[in-house]
Amino acid sequence: MNAPIGVIDSGVGGLTVAKEIIKRLPNETIYYIGDTARCPYGPRSRQEVRNFTWQMAKALEKMNIKMLVIACNTATAVALESLQRNMPFPVLGVINAGARAAVKKTKRHEVVVLATEGTIKSGAYEEALLSLNTSTHIIPLACPTFVPLVESGEYKGEFATKLIAEGLKPLKNQQFDTVILGCTHYPILQKQIEAVVGEEVNVLSSAEETAKDAQEMLAYNGTLANANTVPAHKFFATGSVPIFRSIAENWLEQGTLDIRRITLK
């Protein structure tokens, strides 16, 4: 089935998930919406995030997608279940995938969750981690400056390094062996985060596990694209197309992308 896979996020962070889907499923077409005009979602109310997520999902439903991936942890926490109940196609989130990746890797069951305020407040990661291993010690840390840093496109250089180190200061005297990047923007900062927490710590994104989930779901439903299909990805941003283009083309390394402005209602 050669219909596209829909991927949604508050901004450019979901591109980290899209990249893994493209790598794992090279014949699949991605239709991506980044709500860059209203990013970040972390400080917003649950109702606002739910409404915005539904707007993106409905826009992609009209484009006849075969699956939706909510590539945003904050949106997954508040909207996944309602979308799964009401959409005519499978809907995947990123939180369970991130928790699974961490439980597989941690040796000491001491896990840091770096995320937005909204995701931390939701308690969704704690619930997912403890459902997999009740002895997991979880250290949640909201990093509200990280998403605006990535969205600005200025995430390399000395200023970014200082900002990231400052955001991670509360971890200084904590004991942990694994860090979950509980926001899909954060893998773009992964090298800087690894430099702060140390090379002996596992720093994990949910992107790879989410792409694996997508592949398994499509295979189970018999809706994988034909092996000879040439994908035709489309990207939509509610905010600045040039800024989105700069980040997306740099991160995805897919050449010139088809990127358009979209208005959500």
Curated annotation (Swiss-Prot):
EC number in record: 5.1.1.3
Covalent S-S links between cysteines: none
Residues annotated as the enzyme's active site: 72 (proton donor/acceptor), 183 (proton donor/acceptor)
UniProt entry tagged with the keyword Transmembrane helix: no
Residues involved in substrate binding: 9-10, 41-42, 73-74, 184-185
Keywords: Cell shape, Cell wall biogenesis/degradation, Isomerase, Peptidoglycan synthesis
Keyword Isomerase: yes
Pathway annotation: Cell wall biogenesis; peptidoglycan biosynthesis
Molecular function GO terms recorded: glutamate racemase activity
HAMAP family to which the protein is assigned, alphabetical: Glu_racemase (MF_00258)
Function: Provides the (R)-glutamate required for cell wall biosynthesis.
Protein name per Swiss-Prot or TrEMBL: Glutamate racemase
Source organism of this protein record: Lysinibacillus sphaericus (strain C3-41)
Gene behind the chain: murI
